[in-house]
Amino acid sequence: MLSGGEPLQPEEFEVDGARVHRLRLNPGDTTVTYSASAEDGGPPRAVTPAEWATALRPSRYCPSDQLEGFATTEFDRSLPRAELVGTVAAWVHRRLVYTSGASRPVDTAVDTLLAGQGVCRDYAHLTITLLRALEVPARLVAVYAPGLSPMDFHAVVEADVDGTWCVVDATRLAPTSSLVRICHGRDAADTAFLTLFGGGATLGELTVTATADGDLPVPDDAPFPLP
């Protein structure tokens, strides 16, 4: 990490299990390079009571209280949980057109539904909002996604399926079984890859590369437990 030509010493801490680096930047250009290798992360994550409560509530980009009437008339809440989660993800996939640059940083799931287009975070926000409106706890997960095209940071959804957090990706741009968790939260407000305080900056260049050993499976709507 370099800022204004000088090495940076980041302060590192955890927020909800995610690693956060806090930096004090010098005037001039700042360059941050990060690399890592990941292996099987262990067993699926159980939904805790605190997570259950938080993941049911409306949030900044996921105003589920505004879409409750729409969701309950559009979907059958009596479906088995895994089937309901997959059905909502498939519906969002059909309803939206993936369009780079089509959405604004302030757009909510309601804006996305009306526009009918967006990028991965918009797909995730709409999926989360509909699931919460159907009383299914759901949250956003920022991930590295081998097989994603175009390659970038990626946003997917975790939903409570019979007490276990399971991933669905309404974009179908990357296989869920190859995803590597970066962090999770209520929505994009909790999971931004970069947040600035006390000054201004321009993002000059961003390059993300994520690869996996072996062949990648075909993306689908089946919920998958992400370690």
Predicted regions and their residues:
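Generic structural hydrophobic/aromatic packing signal, biased to beta-strands
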Residues: 1-2, 34, 71, 168, ...
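Hydrophobic/aromatic-rich core segments of domains that either
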Residues: 90, 122-200
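Secondary-structure boundary elements
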Residues: 32, 42, 46-118, 126, ...
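Linear, non-domain "peripheral" regions
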Residues: 1-69, 135
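Short, surface-exposed linear patches
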Residues: 3, 22-23, 53-59, 161-162, ...
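Generic structural "secondary-structure junction" signal
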Residues: 4, 25, 98-100, 115, ...
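Short, surface-exposed, polar/charged, turn-prone segments marking secondary-structure boundaries
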Residues: 8-10, 27-29, 60-65, 166-170, ...
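Low-complexity, flexible helical/coil segments
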Residues: 8-21, 66-75, 174-180, 192-197, ...
